[in-house]
């Protein structure tokens, strides 16, 4: 089905395109159910697999050693149980891929608000944030607004200073609610005038910025 391109969707898509092209670090935040993950997946799925290595992490309660294992496996490196060996292997491989310009590596972390501080600190060490001005891959963090509290920690200042793109979702306006509902109805071959004009204001008031809640309200209205 065709995705509805809201202002938030377009803003996040454009910013994702920019940081992927510039090998930057992006943070995208919103309340639950506003479409961040959908937008992230749509962008990642559109990338050429012969050009990009995409590492998608959603199990964000992982430990530091789990994090290294995931990166190690995704990069096709030698298996080892030693954290120090994995660290060196991953760092060298990222540098090699960058210097030879063979592949672009993207690490995308979803539900970032649950990410352990120890894992974020590993990002700092792995990427040489304290000493090196060069970025070896694109880092994308998508999560709820609470992630900001973690980013404000003093120990994460080197990481925070390197973030070059951030966006917080604003949610649908009333006109977008109508356009979204009409597009949903059309996608299932329903008449686009099933809802009266005043219904859109009610839906807008009840959805509380959540597209997920809006979908539930639409479905219940049609039963």
PLM regions with names:
Residues 1-22:
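A short, basic N-terminal segment
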């Amino acid at each position: 089905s065709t995705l509805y391109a809201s202002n938030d969707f377009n803003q996040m898509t454009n910013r994702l395109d920019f940081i992927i092209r510039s090998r930057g670090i992006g943070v995208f935040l919103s309340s639950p159910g506003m479409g961040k993950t959908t937008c992230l997946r749509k962008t990642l799925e559109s990338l050429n697999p012969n050009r990009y290595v995409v590492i998608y992490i959603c199990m964000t309660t992982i430990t530091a050693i789990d994090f290294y294992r995931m990166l190690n496996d995704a990069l096709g490196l030698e298996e080892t149980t030693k954290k120090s060996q994995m660290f060196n292997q991953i760092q060298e491989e990222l540098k090699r891929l960058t210097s030879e310009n063979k592949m672009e590596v993207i690490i995308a972390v979803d539900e970032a608000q649950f990410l352990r501080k120890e894992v974020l600190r590993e990002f700092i060490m792995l990427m040489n944030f304290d000493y090196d001005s060069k970025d070896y891959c694109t880092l994308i963090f998508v999560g709820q607004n609470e992630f900001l509290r973690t980013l404000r920690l003093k120990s994460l200042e080197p990481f925070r200073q390197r973030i070059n793109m951030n966006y917080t979702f604003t949610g649908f306006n009333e006109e977008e609610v109508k356009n979204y509902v009409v597009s949903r109805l059309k996608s299932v071959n329903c008449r686009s005038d099933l809802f009266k004009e005043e219904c859109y204001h009610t839906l807008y008031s009840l959805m509380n910025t959540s597209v997920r809640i809006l979908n539930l309200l639409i479905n219940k209205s049609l039963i």
